[in-house]
Each structure stands twice: as structure tokens, then as C-alpha cells.
């Protein structure tokens, strides 16, 4: 590993540590109270731990799964001390994340055999969707890849304008039409343009309205179908962007979008301003969709590739 890569990696780690600070402080404050005055893990400690996990937005189903696994360990060792609880919890959360997040990437990469590699981005307005697209474009361009953006969220003039600002900032082309245009038509034009330009990566924004599930499903299905007329088997990735600071609302949004289309990866944003970072653990587990990216700050470098080991390490540091 080069000297510069080491510096970059340590900077990323510091940003991640800082981004999870609020979640960590709140979580371990609650955990300390949960085991106060107790020397061994008993039913009361487990009940308190359950409350801590649920109130940290890990989600009920995932919390129960973690508690069951810890109970199984306690039944094998009746004298398990509360001082060991951190280690056990860390191992169980790492294990859960490993079930869905099988990759171990730390860099922004795409498969070499798919060109252009097409990412369709979905998510409600206000979750940081446009910002995520801009930061992704920046990271891919930094890797020397040729990137094209598509503004297929045509129902909001601001969405097109915001994407144009990011395209100009990063220095990549944006394919767009006027507000109210057919999103599928924009997607078609974007892929046509990408093929002509021999682009490596295409990132297409889509409507951020959780209106009617059937309408949403029909719209996204049409966009996909039209893409496939230009490039077979696209999109290669359907990336759902969720705002980590909304906690349980993020679960509801994931439910709506996974019902409307096949979501293949997640980006969880705004983790730096919240104590609700536990949502990353719960959503990944409940929906069996890998978390690909996390937003841990407002800077252009603060969108990171999600690495389960680094995440757990920062969480329990």
C-alpha cells in the first residue's frame, strides 16, 4: 500500500469515526445504564439491552434476532459477565452484517465486464439522493472513469437544477429534458448518449415521490424496460437512498420501494447528524439488501463505500 493510500485510508477512518460519534455516544450511554449494578448477563440485562437496541433504531425484528443469539450464548455460559457484553454484541452485529454484506470493498469500483455500468437511483425527495449521485459521480471520475448522469426525476424542476449544479461541479455531462417530460424518455436519451460517448458509468436519477405504489411501480418498470432497449440487462444496480437520520421512517421507505421495484443496494445518508445509526444494521438485515454506501459528512469525500468491518470497528471503538 502506498504512503498516500495509507493517509487517505486513515482520513476516511477518522471521518467514519466522527460521523458515528452521536450514534455511539447515545448507544453506549444507554448500554451503561442497562447493565448498571449487574455483574452477569441475566434476563433483566437482556430485557434492558432489547430496549436499548430498539430505541437505537436497530428495528424490532433485528433486535429480537440479536437478543436470541446472545441468549443462546448465555445459556451455554451461565456466568457470562456484563463486561463481556460489548464484545458479544460486537460479534453478533458483525455476523448479521456479514450475512447480507458479503463484499469487502473499501474503494469505489464497478465490474470491468459491464460497460456502461448503469445505476438507477431511487428514493424520496429530501433524503440526499441528488447529493449522493453527485458524490458518486465525483468518486467514479476520480478513478478515471467516464461518467454520464441522467435527470429522470422530471416532476420537480429543483431536482433537475440540483443535478446540473453537481454535474458542473464534478465536470461530467448531464442528459436532461424539460420539467414534466417522460422519465423513460430521459433514461433512453441518457443511455444513447452514454453509448455514443463510450461511457463507463451511467447514473440515472428517478422520481422521488412516494405517491401511489402502483404508479411508482409502473413508472420504474417503464424506465427499466426502455433502458433495456439501448443496453441489455440494465440497470445493473438499483440503488435506494435512505436518510439515516429518519430512523424508523427509513424502514417504511425501504418497504415501499422494495415493493415497487427490485432494489439491489442501499445508500444510507446523513449518519453524521444523528444518533440513529443503528438503522444501518436493521435495514440491511430486515430487507436482505447490502448497504453499498454511507454518508458521514457534508464534504464531497464524505460518501464512503460501506465496509462492515470498519463500520463495526468505529461503532464499538
Predicted stretch roles:
Residues 207-209:
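Short glycine-rich anion-binding loops that position phosphate/pyrophosphate groups of nucleotides
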Residues 4, 10-16, 21:
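Switch/coupling subdomain of P-loop NTPase systems
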Residues 153-154, 244:
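Residue-level signal for short, function-critical loop segments
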Residues 3, 105-107, 136, 252-253, ...:
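Short beta-alpha junctions and helix-cap segments that line functional grooves
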Residues 162, 182-197, 211-317:
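Conserved catalytic-core segment of NTP-binding enzymes
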Residues 3-10, 28, 35-36:
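Short, aromatic- and cysteine-enriched interfacial helices/patches
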Residues 17, 21-152, 159-179, 187-195, ...:
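Primarily NTPase-proximal linker/entry elements flanking Walker-type ATP/GTP-binding cores
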Residues 60-62, 156, 272, 300:
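Short hydrophobic/aromatic residue motifs in ordered secondary structure
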Amino acid at each position: 500500500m502506498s504512503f498516500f493510500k495509507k493517509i487517505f485510508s486513515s482520513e476516511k477512518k477518522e471521518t467514519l469515526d466522527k460521523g458515528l460519534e452521536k450514534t455511539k455516544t447515545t448507544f453506549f450511554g444507554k448500554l451503561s445504564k442497562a447493565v448498571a449494578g449487574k455483574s452477569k448477563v441475566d434476563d433483566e440485562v437482556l430485557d434492558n439491552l432489547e430496549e436499548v437496541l430498539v430505541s437505537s433504531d436497530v428495528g424490532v425484528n433485528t433486535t429480537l434476532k440479536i437478543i436470541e443469539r446472545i441468549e443462546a450464548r448465555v445459556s451455554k455460559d451461565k456466568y457470562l459477565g456484563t463486561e463481556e457484553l460489548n464484545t458479544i454484541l460486537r460479534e453478533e452485529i458483525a455476523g448479521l452484517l456479514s450475512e447480507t454484506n458479503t463484499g469487502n470493498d473499501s474503494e469505489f469500483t464497478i465490474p470491468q465486464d459491464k460497460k456502461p455500468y448503469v445505476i438507477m437511483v431511487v428514493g424520496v425527495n429530501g433524503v440526499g439522493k441528488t447529493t449522493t449521485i453527485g458524490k458518486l459521480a465525483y468518486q467514479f471520475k476520480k478513478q478515471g472513469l467516464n461518467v454520464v448522469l441522467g435527470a429522470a426525476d422530471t416532476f420537480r424542476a429543483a431536482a433537475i437544477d440540483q443535478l446540473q449544479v453537481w454535474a458542473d461541479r464534478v465536470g461530467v455531462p448531464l442528459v436532461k429534458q424539460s420539467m414534466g417530460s417522460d422519465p423513460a424518455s430521459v433514461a433512453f436519451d441518457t443511455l444513447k448518449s452514454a453509448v455514443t460517448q463510450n461511457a463507463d458509468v451511467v447514473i440515472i436519477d428517478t422520481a422521488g415521490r412516494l405517491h401511489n405504489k402502483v404508479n411508482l411501480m409502473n413508472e420504474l418498470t417503464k424506465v427499466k424496460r426502455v433502458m433495456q432497449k439501448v443496453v441489455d440487462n440494465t440497470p445493473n444496480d438499483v440503488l435506494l437512498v435512505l436518510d439515516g437520520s429518519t430512523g424508523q421512517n427509513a424502514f417504511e421507505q425501504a418497504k415501499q420501494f422494495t415493493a415497487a421495484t427490485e432494489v439491489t443496494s442501499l445508500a444510507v445518508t446523513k449518519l453524521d447528524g444523528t444518533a440513529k445509526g443503528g438503522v444501518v444494521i436493521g435495514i440491511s438485515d430486515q430487507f436482505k439488501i447490502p448497504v453499498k454506501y454511507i454518508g458521514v459528512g457534508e464534504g464531497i469525500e464524505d460518501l464512503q463505500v460501506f465496509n462492515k468491518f470498519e463500520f463495526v470497528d468505529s461503532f464499538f471503538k
